[in-house]
Amino acid sequence: MNPEAFFRQLDERGKKMGVRFGPQPLMSNSRKAMEGGEFAKEHGKYKAYHEAVFRAFFTYCRDIGDRAVILEIARGVGLDTVALTTALERSIYLPRLQATTKNAKTNGFSAAPTFVIEGYGSVSGAQPIDTFRKILRGVEKVTNPEPLATMN
């Protein structure tokens, strides 16, 4: 699938959930943004940072591989940008990311996101909600005679 079609499809799926995806002029190298995520995690700001990076890239089409964008996001969620700059320059969190990648590959994961569902296996990539409903209903039939009330 070409990038334009991919992002159109994402926008259609997201629109139903109140999330918009803008057309992407480029695919950013997200490694430094991910290192920033590890920094944010250590400073109690991971969720806010992660959501801000998501919006910056997917909604506002910002280049999350650009250090200035990363620092602007970090500042916006209350992180110390001087300390983050040092961490990024020294690649302090790179070994952690590399270990996570190695662990994922060792366990057979090659795409993000990957969801592991007990009684089924794994589902890779951005899938429609109906895919998960179908899988969970199948697992439910095997593991639970009572239907899940919350699934529509």
Segments predicted by a language model, with ranges:
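Structural alpha/beta surface segment adjacent to cysteine/selenocysteine redox centers
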Residues: M1-Y60, P147
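C-terminal cap of thioredoxin/glutaredoxin-like
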Residues: E38, K45-A48, A52-N152
